[in-house]
Structure formats: structure tokens, C-alpha cells
């Protein structure tokens, strides 16, 4: 398997947020077994509706009914990044693009660290902008204890 930065076009990812390195370590600890390339990911049981088009996503809508965490790490032009959430959904925007309706605050990591969330669950979907593929990480709960 390639490294984290081979999948995601992020420059100096460790400098963006100190905690990201810890989370990256946790997510990709067993990446050979846990990352699955799903070109046409459509699972109604998890209620994930993803518009994962190429490098130009004008309307990237994530409608979630579960605890799903989306990592957008593309070099693309996203004009409308709309997240309709019924539960705890967090966006990590770690890209170097024009993003009119987004931020680069790493909400997912900030919530773990600052709000002392005891457990983080289910699926983390990674949008890579490489051939419109989705990379799925199998469920691994994250706790503050794990990253502290």
C-alpha cells in the first residue's frame, strides 16, 4: 500500500494541526487490511449519500443519519459543501482550494480534543479526488484516552 500522502494531496499535513498526526497514526495503523477502494459505494443501511464527482464539486452534499465523519482532502473547487446532519457528523477540510462555504478548522479533531468526547464511532469516508474513488476505513472507535 502507498503512504497516506500518496492517497491525499496534502502538503505538510503534520504542520496543519499537531493532533492530526496522532489521528492519522490511528486511522492508518492497519491500512493494508482496512482501506477498501469502492468506486461505486452505495450502502443504504449506513445512509451515506455522497456526491463524489472529480476535482470540481459544485454541490458536495453529505446527508447522514449515523455517526459518519467525512474527510475532504482534495485540491478542488468546492463552492457549496453542504452537510445535513441528524447526528454527530464532522468535516475535516484539509485542502488548498477555493472553498466558499467551508473552513479549515478540523472540527472532527477539535471535538475529540477540546470537547472531551469519550468515544467516536463508525465509518470514516475519505474523498480523495483521485478518479472519484471512496476509501473506506473499517470501524475503529476512537477515545480521548487513545490520542492523549
UniProtKB/Swiss-Prot annotation:
Composition skew (Low complexity), residue ranges: 37-94
UniProt-annotated stretches for the region Disordered: 37-99
The protein, known as: Putative uncharacterized protein DDB_G0288037
Native source species: Dictyostelium discoideum (Social amoeba)
Amino acid at each position: 500500500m502507498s503512504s497516506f500522502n500518496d492517497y491525499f494531496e496534502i502538503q505538510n499535513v503534520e504542520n496543519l494541526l499537531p493532533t492530526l498526526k496522532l489521528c492519522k497514526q490511528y486511522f492508518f495503523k492497519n491500512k493494508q487490511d482496512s482501506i477498501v477502494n469502492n468506486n461505486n459505494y452505495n450502502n443504504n443501511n449506513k445512509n451515506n449519500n455522497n456526491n463524489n464527482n472529480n476535482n470540481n464539486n459544485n454541490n458536495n452534499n453529505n446527508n447522514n443519519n449515523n455517526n459518519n465523519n467525512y474527510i475532504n482532502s482534495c485540491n478542488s473547487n468546492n463552492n457549496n459543501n453542504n452537510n445535513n446532519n441528524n447526528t454527530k457528523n464532522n468535516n475535516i477540510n484539509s485542502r488548498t482550494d477555493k472553498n466558499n462555504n467551508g473552513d479549515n478548522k478540523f472540527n472532527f479533531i477539535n471535538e475529540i480534543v477540546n470537547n472531551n468526547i469519550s468515544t467516536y464511532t463508525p465509518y470514516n469516508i475519505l474523498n480523495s479526488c483521485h478518479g472519484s474513488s471512496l476509501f473506506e476505513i473499517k470501524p475503529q472507535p476512537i477515545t480521548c484516552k487513545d490520542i492523549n
